Amino acid sequence: MFILTMGLNHHTAPIDIREKLVFKESEEEMALVTLQQEKSILENVIISTCNRTEIIAVVDQIHTGRYYLKRFMANWFQMDMEKIEPYLFFHEESDAVNHLYKVTAGLDSLVLGETQILGQVKHAFEIAKQTATTGTLLNKLFREVVTFAKKVHHHTKINENAVSVSYAAVEVAKKLYGSLDNKKIVLVGAGEMSELALQNLAGSGIADITIINRTKSNAELLANQFQAKVGAYENMNEHLMLADIVLVSTSAAEPIIKQAAMQDLMEQKASSMLVIDIGLPRNVEHDCSYIPNFHLYDIDDLAGVVSANSLERQRIVLELEKTIEAEVRNFFEWEKQLGVVPVIRALREKALDMQEVTMTSLENKLPGLTEREYIQIGKHMKSIINQMLKQPISELKEMSVEEDATTSIEHFKRIFGLSETDVTVIEKEQAETRS
């Protein structure tokens, strides 16, 4: 078993690529189940946010795991694998665990130290647990990672005055207008990002705030908290006509603010308008940026604003990275104690030995086979072995954390004809590799 992470984020892919590779919340469970059915995949969790789409998986083999993760991503989003590959990154084993710790603690975020990602990781883990795509390894890993991130935010100053994307949006507005006194702002969307923006706007001098949302009741709840007005979604353009600043953050799959409509609107509007799109996929058509006096910013445009982090926070990051390295070591020490890895390897090697004997016999009995036919038969035979072993391996992992784990594992070895010698040889090889 190996831990493998595949993904893309704001470091590796621009927004026009990221927005095409976002898992819709309504499809998360189906995506998890579909991926779990792929060969080589034993466990999986999918994290999909505005700045990253990452899959954390337990696989039976690294090289096959890489292939099936890429194939799943390409198939799910109906894109050629070759078009996706340049934007993907892979982390294996300790690097994968290290990366997840950093992501969850906010150290890999566009906004250093932000806490929103912790909730997003917890949500992703909960969905995977409910869907039964996690097991022994990922259950342990995610619990440890979430606990660590909570301690980080509680005991350090990494998130003290942490710049958020919503904060950055407000800062952009201040830079453009100098002062926000008496400016009119329209928020399209009533989710978490809009709420954060309203918190950052407190005391900024904004005179008029209107919240527009497809579900009016959600807009009303938010408006009551911040003494804002509620606008009708169907009359959005009328409200935009009067706005100085527009912040858009909805879960819409397609842009809701179109270039043609904005072209007409801006020709009638007497003043310029700042539009900040922090949705992913983007909520505003990119071509709107070419309209005179229509100042459009998306998430990637805000990167420069949020990159200025204090030296104190950078120092804390360096200390946390050392702590994370220790956490990673502890996790793999725990994994070694499971005692099932040598059993799994012994089982796999026994199966491969049987395959080799069978292939040799086949070659002798059917000398007329071409090399291509021989190779194809070998591939299919290996595929059958992998599928046959997938469920027993999953069950063995679950046995390893039960109270009577030792007895259960011994029964497992007897059922599959694994001798103590078979397992001991593997254990010695592992010890030599680690040393």
UniProtKB/Swiss-Prot annotation:
Positions marked as site (Important for activity): H99
Active-site residues, record numbering mapped to chain: C50 (nucleophile)
PROSITE patterns in alphabetical order: GLUTR (PS00747)
N-terminal signal peptide: none
Binding site for substrate: T49, C50, N51, R52, S109, E114, T115, Q116, Q120
EC number per UniProt: 1.2.1.70
Enzyme superclass (EC): oxidoreductase
Pathway as given in its UniProt record: Porphyrin-containing compound metabolism; protoporphyrin-IX biosynthesis; 5-aminolevulinate from L-glutamyl-tRNA(Glu): step 1/2
Key words, A-Z: NADP, Oxidoreductase, Porphyrin biosynthesis
Superkingdom of origin organism: Bacteria
Cross-referenced InterPro entries: 4pyrrol_synth_GluRdtase (IPR000343), 4pyrrol_synth_GluRdtase_dimer (IPR015896), 4pyrrol_synth_GluRdtase_N (IPR015895), GluRdtase_CS (IPR018214), GluRdtase_dimer_dom_sf (IPR036453), GluRdtase_N_sf (IPR036343), NAD(P)-bd_dom_sf (IPR036291), Shikm_DH/Glu-tRNA_Rdtase (IPR006151)
GO molecular function: glutamyl-tRNA reductase activity; NADP binding
Residues annotated for NADP(+) binding in this entry: G189, A190, G191, E192, M193, S194
Catalytic reaction annotation: (S)-4-amino-5-oxopentanoate + tRNA(Glu) + NADP(+) = L-glutamyl-tRNA(Glu) + NADPH + H(+)
Misc. remarks from the entry: During catalysis, the active site Cys acts as a nucleophile attacking the alpha-carbonyl group of tRNA-bound glutamate with the formation of a thioester intermediate between enzyme and glutamate, and the concomitant release of tRNA(Glu). The thioester intermediate is finally reduced by direct hydride transfer from NADPH, to form the product GSA.
Domain notes: Possesses an unusual extended V-shaped dimeric structure with each monomer consisting of three distinct domains arranged along a curved 'spinal' alpha-helix. The N-terminal catalytic domain specifically recognizes the glutamate moiety of the substrate. The second domain is the NADPH-binding domain, and the third C-terminal domain is responsible for dimerization.
Complexes and interactors: Homodimer.
Functional description taken from the UniProt entry: Catalyzes the NADPH-dependent reduction of glutamyl-tRNA(Glu) to glutamate 1-semialdehyde (GSA).
Family stated for the protein in its record: Belongs to the glutamyl-tRNA reductase family.
Annotated protein name in UniProt: Glutamyl-tRNA reductase
Organism: Listeria monocytogenes serotype 4b (strain CLIP80459)
Gene that encodes it: hemA
